Amino acid sequence: MLVHVGQKKPGAMRLAKTRMRELEALAETAGVEVVERIIQLRDRVDPKYVLGKGKLESVLIKAIDLDVETMIFDQNLNPTQASTIASRTDLAVIDRTQLILDIFAQRAESKDGKLQVELAQLKYSLPRLGAKDDALSRLTGGIGGRGPGETKLEVGRRRAQERLNRLERQLKEQTKQRAQRRRRRTSDDVPVVAIVGYTNAGKSTLLNALTNAGVLAENKLFATLDTRSRRLSLPQGNNIILS
């Protein structure tokens, strides 16, 4: 179930429908089956329930009728909102950022990319630990037992923080190695040219057409996450590195 909540103002419904179409495309890319779409425009977004308590109850009834397992909010939720909605609905509750990070986790192929995605997921999700025990298990890979005097939640937070610290150390080392490779490329006096564009704009398709790179190119949002670099010979005889 997709949910968009916005303020009443001129053009708000048109914007909501546009964002909802993109959110649905993101959900489909993540492998989620969308069975319902909810748009609510309010005088102000409810600071606790986002939708408003009454509207949330009616949405929950619809979710039960449709056998919904997950609510995906178009806007980012703060930890209190995510926890409150999950507790009242007993559904998995995620927001746009978490959905995009999930897609990144599916698409990342390089070691560097996987580390960056996991670090981003931990940083975003750590403040949200505690809404549900299963959310804690998903984040930390399962919690076996308790530390002395610690609750399951405290153990989960501690282990998540430890993992986050390890990832930051690994990424620091990866950054050093990447800088060394970049210095080697620039020492060859070969210009590096970047292809820049919005997701699904055709960057990978263009790279393949110019260099026969063989990079995955699909009509999906964030189909390719990792950067690929290939040497390209120009008609004048010069070479460039195209990324």
Q: What does each of the following model-derived ranges do?
A:
Residues 1-102:
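N-terminal accessory targeting/assembly segments
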Residues 23, 122, 160:
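A residue-level signal for conserved active-site and pocket-lining positions in enzyme catalytic cores
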Residues 10, 129, 202:
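Short, acidic Gly/Pro/Ser/Thr-rich loop/turn segments
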Residues 132-243:
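Conserved G1/Walker A P-loop phosphate-binding module
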Residues 9-15, 45-49, 107-112, 152, ...:
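Flexible beta-alpha connector loops of hexameric P-loop NTPases
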Residues 98-99, 127, 159:
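Short acidic/polar capping segments at secondary-structure boundaries
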Residues 119, 123-137:
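A charged, well-structured terminal subsegment
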Residues 98-119:
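Short alpha-helix plus adjacent loop in nuclease-associated cores
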